[in-house]
Curated annotation (Swiss-Prot):
<dbReference type="GO" id="GO:0003735">
    <property type="term" value="F:structural constituent of ribosome"/>
</dbReference>
<comment type="subunit">
    <text>Component of the mitochondrial ribosome small subunit (28S) which comprises a 12S rRNA and about 30 distinct proteins.</text>
</comment>
<keyword id="KW-0809">Transit peptide</keyword>
<dbReference type="Pfam" id="PF14943">
    <property type="entry name" value="MRP-S26"/>
</dbReference>
<protein>
    <recommendedName>
        <fullName>Small ribosomal subunit protein mS26</fullName>
    </recommendedName>
</protein>
<dbReference type="GO" id="GO:0032543">
    <property type="term" value="P:mitochondrial translation"/>
</dbReference>
<keyword id="KW-0687">Ribonucleoprotein</keyword>
<keyword id="KW-0496">Mitochondrion</keyword>
<dbReference type="InterPro" id="IPR026140">
    <property type="entry name" value="Ribosomal_mS26"/>
</dbReference>
<comment type="similarity">
    <text>Belongs to the mitochondrion-specific ribosomal protein mS26 family.</text>
</comment>
<keyword id="KW-0689">Ribosomal protein</keyword>
<dbReference type="GO" id="GO:0005763">
    <property type="term" value="C:mitochondrial small ribosomal subunit"/>
</dbReference>
Amino acid sequence: MLRAGCQLLTQSTLPTGKTVGNSFALEFVRWRRKPRWLPVAKSKMFRVPERKKQSEEERTELMRLHNQYKTQLRSVRQFLREEVVRHEETSTADHIVLTPEQEEAEFQKCLDANAAWNAAIAKERDQRLAKKREEKVAYIQERLEAQQLREEERKEQANQRVLLEIERSKNYITRENLDAAIETALANPVDHNFAIDMAGNLYHGRSTSQLPDATPEPNQQVLSN
């Protein structure tokens, strides 16, 4: 076993003009006692320890304490043994004294008590199950009402969407009004191009024949800051 320790060096112990880094020392430490897993040493294998000699007073006192302990322990054992025997005799006597009619009456009494307990427990169970059944019915009814309300809202939204599409369908291009739609588109061209001048005026269209005046034209728009 090794023990690592830092060696403390003072300035007086250091030689002049030399520096010492972290000094490290190793110290060998032996076991204080022999480990328990090692066998007996050969030098002590056949050694018989000398028995300590007791004085007559000490031996007499130890014997007195030993006898006192044995006597007390024997008394406790005897008391417990008598208690067990008395309990067995009492139980056996009670059992022997009872007649068959008394045993039948006692058994019937136990049956009646058991039946009363079962009836009380059954009543409590029925009440608990009835309460749970009512709560479950109320929960299901609430869920059904919520589902019905959601279904009505969904139908209302669907009807509004259908009405909106019907209104939009009036402007749809079909086979019947396809030619008229083409003629209308050719007669009214739409140009999304525009231009902006230095004054911030916005001109829609690709070409403009006039310069901007004080009042903007229909195709002219003034940009606000």
